[in-house]
Amino acid sequence: SVDNSKGLVSLIALEMGGSADLCMLLNPGDPVVLMGPTGTPTEVFQNETVVLVGGGLGNAVLFSIGAAARASGCKVLYFAGYKKRIDRYKVAEIEAAADTIVWCCDEEPGFKPSRQGDFGFVGNIVQAMVAYGSGALGPQPISLKDADRIIAIGSDRMMAAVGIARHQQLKPYLKDNHFAIGSINSPMQCMMKEICAQCLQPHKDPKTGEITYVFSCFNQDQELDLVDFGGLASRLKQNSVQEKLTRHWISHCLRQLS
């Protein structure tokens, strides 16, 4: 988030080893270089019913999109998913960004909603959407059938699962002409937009089979039905060996040599 009045940019770093471990060593006043910006602002339409589907760190992005959608007269139904109960943060901001929230957690006992009209669910996010759409969670303050737009942000596997579920177990609860996009988390490198092609993402037309390529750094919001998630998974794994070596080397330096 950005506070223009104070000139502050707020960031959230996920502790996964390697460079994230270096972030733990930062002290107030240390210089930090941010590269970018990449991507394109998410398109927000007026007076729609919008379904936000967030997994893990994706929720750090979605609450700003939800706030913008509500400001444009949209109804916002938010499925916020987490692996563990300790992973949840920015609860007040998420609540302010949605009319109705389904808090999903893989870990029991899950979350207890603090607002009337919100729900808690133990299980994955697709299961939560099915439970909500079927009425298993109770009356729907916002009907899933009214959804004009679905915006999914999270891991590549979560977005792929949502994309597939729309045509299978979620199909009875969605109208045919809804529009679904995902914020594609392609690997980045140059941060200069359409230069290095590290973020190149294959698309496959479901009707013709034609394959095209786009730069995710130019526009991260891509139609779920077009994205080749197998290709994305391969791209995300391409630096796996180097990333593991870097993580072990930094861990060795920080914990064993210090």
Where do the model's predicted regions map?
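FAD-binding FR-type
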Residues: S1-V51
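Cofactor-binding loop segments of dinucleotide-utilizing enzymes, especially the Rossmann-like FAD-
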Residues: L14-M16, P37, G55, G81-K83, ...
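Short amphipathic alpha-helical segments
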Residues: M24, N47, S64-G66, V91, ...
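Short, glycine-rich nucleotide/cofactor-binding loops
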Residues: T49-N59
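Structural beta-sheet core signal
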Residues: V51-L52, L77-A80, W103, A152
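Histidine-anchored nucleotide/phosphate-binding helix
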Residues: N59-R70
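Conserved S-adenosyl-L-methionine
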Residues: A69-V76, D99
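Reductase modules of NAD(P)H-dependent flavoproteins
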Residues: I86-S258
